[in-house]
Amino acid sequence: MMIKIISVGKLKQKAFVDLINDYLKRINHYLKCQEIVVSDEPEPVQISNKSLEQIKSKEASKIFKNINQNDFVIALIIESNIISSETLAKKIQQWLNTFSHDICFIIGGSNGLHESIYERANYHLSMSKMTFAHGLAKVMLCEQIYRALSILNNGKYHK
């Protein structure tokens, strides 16, 4: 069992990449964690609702290639459950105790996630009602996963 953090689009900001890599190393101290980045689709100059759905559908197909049938999937979505760090820790513990497969956190690209990802997800999670830059959201997710595992293992990180 491991945690997979699946996101759409490669980050260009070195500062975000460095922070994510640091948190991934910390997470791996407690539980194996893998970062998976699927390529985002190019956007036409003038984007219609139809082409937006096609883009999200193609990105969803790439995401699904990295999810196994029995994986527990958490989709990040603004219009969803906002929970505390302590509650996330309890939920991760519950998921680890209940499911024998991987736990997958999914972060969409700039256009969000396709409806099929939301339908497949076992849980919807929001970090805030605010919108964050893609890289910042990924850093925040990694930090919260590390914090949750630190809480579960009585680490000194969470005070």
UniProtKB/Swiss-Prot annotation:
Residues reported in the UniProt entry to bind S-adenosyl-L-methionine: L76, G108, M127, S128, K129, M130, T131, F132
The UniProt catalytic activity note for this protein reads: pseudouridine(1915) in 23S rRNA + S-adenosyl-L-methionine = N(3)-methylpseudouridine(1915) in 23S rRNA + S-adenosyl-L-homocysteine + H(+)
- Pfam families, sorted: SPOUT_MTase
Query: Per the database entry, which stretches of residues form a coiled coil?
Result: none
Q: What class of enzyme is it?
A: transferase
Superkingdom of the source species: Bacteria
Write out the GO MF terms. rRNA (pseudouridine-N3-)-methyltransferase activity
- Entry's InterPro entries? Alpha/beta_knot_MTases, RlmH-like, tRNA_m1G_MTases_N
- What UniProt keywords apply to this chain's record, in alphabetical order? Cytoplasm, Methyltransferase, rRNA processing, S-adenosyl-L-methionine, Transferase
Name the family. Answer: Belongs to the RNA methyltransferase RlmH family.
PANTHER family, per database record = METHYLTRANSFERASE, RIBOSOMAL RNA LARGE SUBUNIT METHYLTRANSFERASE H
> What is this protein identified as?
Ribosomal RNA large subunit methyltransferase H
Origin organism is Ureaplasma parvum serovar 3 (strain ATCC 700970)
